[in-house]
Amino acid sequence: ESGKRMSVLEQDHSLFDSNSVLETVIMGDISLYQIKKEIDSLYENYSDENAEKIGSLQVKFEEMDGWNAESNAASLLSNLGIKESLHQTQMNDIDPKLKVRILLAKSLFGNPDVLVMDEPTNDLDYETITWLEDYLANFDNCIIVVSHDRHFLDSVCTHISDIDFGKINHYSGNYTFWYESSQLAARQRAQQNKKAEEKKKELE
């Protein structure tokens, strides 16, 4: 949908190796990041000719809450266990397990309209998972998550889509509701199949 922004939890941990940790997180909102870079570039080559363009870009930047971008990114990083001393470090110098947390912060940055996450709790400790669960529980927009963490799904999900034998079934509820409902449906199918077999034998 036009005007909506989708954010995806990156799986390629080397994709941002030439960027700093803080810069990587801000790149979660690529439009904001590009405006920021353009403003910086125009200031480096400042002239009367580009002053008007700088002013126009700064208006857009303010509308996107750009002046708070670094502090918002830093807050996400700190909540995900990334020390402030690492925020200006290049990504290629970061421990791979910490990169997971940084890319998670990137996906959350800027309150995207649609957030897509594949196994977001991998390599996270209990404290960080608990923080993420609380954060997502208060997230107002759409979240699409794939996870094998049952407790996480129970805490975060309000709807479950189950893909089984090429068919998609949708359930309104968390993981426990889906599990109980799917088990009940499986038992009912088994009973129906049994009755059908018994009736078939009677007719033979």
Language-model regions, residue ranges each:
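Short cytosolic helices in intracellular loops of multi-pass membrane proteins
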Residues: 194-204
